[in-house]
Amino acid sequence: MNRFTAYAALFFIFSLCSTAKEAGFQHPAFNFRGTSTMSALSGDYSAAPTPLYKSWALPSSLNLTTQPPPLLTDRSYYELVQALISKMRLDCQTVGDMTWRHLSEMLFASWNSVKEVSLKAASVTLWAIISIWFGLYWTLARLITLFLWTFSIEALCLILLGCITSLIYKGALSLSEHLPVFLFMSPLKIIWRAAFSKRNYKNEKAVEGYKGFSVPQKPPKSAVIELQHENGSHLGYANCIRLYSGENALVTAEHCLEGAFATSLKTGNRIPMSTFFPIFKSARNDISILVGPPNWEGLLSVKGAHFITADKIGKGPASFYTLEKGEWMCHSATIDGAHHQFVSVLCNTGPGYSGTGFWSSKNLLGVLKGFPLEEECNYNVMSVIPSIPGITSPNYVFESTAVKGRVFSDETVKELEREASEAVKKLARFKSLTGKNWANDYDSDEDYGLEKEAATNAPAEKTAQTNSAEKTAPSTSAEKTAPTNKPFKWASGTARQNKRQLRHPRRRYKRTTNGQNGRTDHHSYGGENQSLGDRGEDSEQGVSESPAEAQTKQTRKTWREEQAKQFTSYFDAIYKWGAQEEGCPPGFRKCGNIPGYYHPRTKGETKWGQKLCQVHPELADKTAGFGWPKAGFEAELQSLNLQAARWLQRAESATIPGAEARKRVIEKTVEAYRNCITNAPLCSLKSKLDWAGFQQDIREAVQSLELDAGVGIPYIAYGLPTHRGWVEDHKLLPVLTQLTFDRLQKMSEASFEDMSAEELVQEGLCDPIRLFVKGEPHKQSKLDEGRYRLIMSVSLVDQLVARVLFQNQNKREISLWRSVPSKPGFGLSTDTQTAEFLECLQKVSGAPSVEELCANHKEHTRPTDCSGFDWSVAYWMLEDDMEVRNRLTFNNTQLTERLRAAWLKCIGNSVLCLSDGTLLAQTVPGVQKSGSYNTSSSNSRIRVMAAYHCGADWAMAMGDDALEAPNSDLEEYKTLGFKVEVGRELEFCSHIFRNPTLAVPVNTNKMLYKLIHGYNPECGNPEVIQNYLAAVFSVLQELRHDRELVAKLHQWLVPSATTKEH
């Protein structure tokens, strides 16, 4: 019921609304024409207009009456709402019109104001400019008028001279139109270049002090060819290499290309280098890689050789080839290091050697550039081949073959690769005047009879191989590349026609790159995506690392650092520090102790030696007066007391030269050693220690270690007594590397200037130095006195630190001993070496001949020897030696000087460790440590500098032995703290020079005693017998000039029974 009532109500309401709406829309006021719509919409229903009726349509008798306007309440809700909405819209329109009218008036007024102000400002500005300009002219006119009025005659003369000069210029200009301009410009250019230009490099140099060899030998694969001028005269050399793109190419110095002809010694053919297209060319690096016209390899009869790019070049021996009288000669060279973007090479070159390649076995390393002029460096430089993916390097990663470490740092390699990438892209963008380049030509079907392959039939991609690539030739047409005056004919034949040519390397490079900084497309060669020059911190090859590789590297680094910390804690735990002043040697104090890890035993005479002396009394007479010293901490302490007392006694009477004298000697020493200028370590080229550069330095340092030498304190505690145990263990070597790096890091950061000797050890800047008696025969007088020769052995880590900081200089001195005063690199084992040394001495001393030098040596030189030299070296001498080292470092940095200063502080203020574990700290700085890496080099230089302090014009030294100028004042040595003895004969390095080819050893009897009492061949051990026989023949070689003695010794020391039974 309720539901029915609700439905009825709704139906009633709906009907009501519908009726009202229908009634409203059909009202006469809305349906007839003429109804005011605006009135209806506005709701003005009180005055609705009357509909218009035609008069003829109305009945005549009908009376019309006016209807009253309907009330609002009579309207429907729909009409009321529509009227209200219309009212609101009209009101809004009215308000908007009023607002727009007022806004327009305001904007118009503002525009007029701004326009008026702008016009006034422009007018004022223009009048200001006019006033200033007019003022300048007016002022200038007044000044000119004043000048002419005051200096009338002078002004008239200037005007006349100006007119004359103008006439002369016009006459010269008219004359130059009928004469070649170069007649005037060429002399001016020559004068300008001679006066103002400066070349940074000269193209040939013979390295002073370097002695190489030359043997007849052909280049590998005949890959070296001669470059000639157009008239046939020699110009330089070029080298044929095999690119990774498959083509053969020529590599030469960029300065050798102009007007050059590639010439074959075998075939006699000549090809102008202008027909070769450069795929890489760098004037800054002075190297060009060029590919030639078709069949150029056959015309020149060459084959492509393998090569090594800049990122893989390491130090070591090398060779280069030149033509001499129509025959190829092989010359020796040594890859020494880096010089800017070049590689420094020790070799002797001459005019016309430019462009020749340096070879390691059958691999090309680079081409000869010349040598630097601005630094007066004593070496040549080599231009290297940059790594260009797809051209000079593969698109995937190799393991480096440079076993001795790379020459260049990562930054230099990145720079070389970046320049190479830019150069290749520049060539790729190059367009000739015709709009079409030779390298853009596809293989010519008319020339070779080949059919172009459709893109759908392209061969499957092949993976590039390391040492074997498909042999190809540049894709070009003979008609486009042959010059007008052809010096040769193109080769043709079925072999040429049947071989499909690959595209030019430049086009190949464009095809394999996406134009994104040289990044290669992984679809090109089957390799990885590789960014040119994108290398990680520790990367050997300069490739981007995957996240997995980066994670692995970080894991290894974390493990290495943690292991180094553990080992450091392990070694620190063995020290027991505690100072004690009583009962210590002079200049030392006891600062602690460690467990006794060393237990040396005193040697005695062997039964073999006693037997030989009994059988051969003459041998007994020769070996009499020698014996073995005692060993152990008591002998060490006894000898240390004697030598330290003498050291301090001499130091008290010595005086330090003044600042000017030291500066003069340092500058003279630097000039004498200028041929040994070397680079700083790679690890210290930046403001902070660089791990990547350190890896290269430590690799070279480890490989130069003496593996059978002792590890020293505290590393003996680990139970591995020699270097070999640490170096050859693949788990311990990374830890050793990290320990060395951590020490260098501490040296670069610590404030060590005021530290004591034991504090340096406690802070981890250095290790104690092991002290022991050297196991060599001593004279009986020294044995009776107890003054034994002490050796101060530096620890393994300190050895590596010294090698990292100084190995470049020390090795250069050894290589160039002929041109520097220090002679650690020379020997006297052969007559040739003896003659060579005497020739060097003759040149330095100014003697007319070697014979005259040997006969009257006192007039030309003075042989001197310092007794107890190591103990006589004062700390200021070590400082001056370090100053010379820093000045001889080409690219020295503040970090390098800081590290070397820390090393000097540690070596001059050391903690000595006796065999029983007693630790003795130096209280007086100084003393050269005999087991240090720098001992031989620094002692020789300090000895030379001491001679300079005594007024010698020249000097040469080998440790404490020296030959110096006769004008040296020997009395001055006492003021320096040295005890110097003058030899009566021409003696140097324990040899007496009798004639130009004869050097007799001084310590013959000592050598014989050590030989017969240092070995026991009767034990039957093959290794002992082998070492004994090697020592015997070494002694016989030293005594080779005394034939009678050699025959006797051979009979005594090498009996037939020994050789037969064993």
From Swiss-Prot:
Parts of the chain that traverse the membrane: 121-141, 144-164, 172-192
Signal peptide: 1-20
GO MF terms held by the record: nucleotide binding; RNA binding; RNA-directed RNA polymerase activity; serine-type endopeptidase activity; serine-type exopeptidase activity
Domain RdRp catalytic: 859-974
GO cellular component: membrane
Family matches, as CDD domains: ps-ssRNAv_Solemoviridae_RdRp
Residue numbers annotated as active site: 255 (for protease activity), 286 (for protease activity), 354 (for protease activity)
Pfam families linked: Peptidase_S39, RdRP_4
BP GO terms, sorted: DNA-templated transcription; proteolysis; viral RNA genome replication; viral translational frameshifting
Post-translational modification summary for this protein: Specific enzymatic cleavages in vivo yield mature proteins. The protease probably cleaves itself and releases the RdRp (Potential). Cleavages have been shown in the P1 protein, but since the N-terminus containing the serine protease is shared between P1 and P1-P2, cleavages should also occur within the P1-P2 protein.
Catalytic activity, EC: 3.4.21.-, 2.7.7.48
Site (described: Cleavage): 204-205, 399-400
Name assigned to this protein: Protein P1-P2
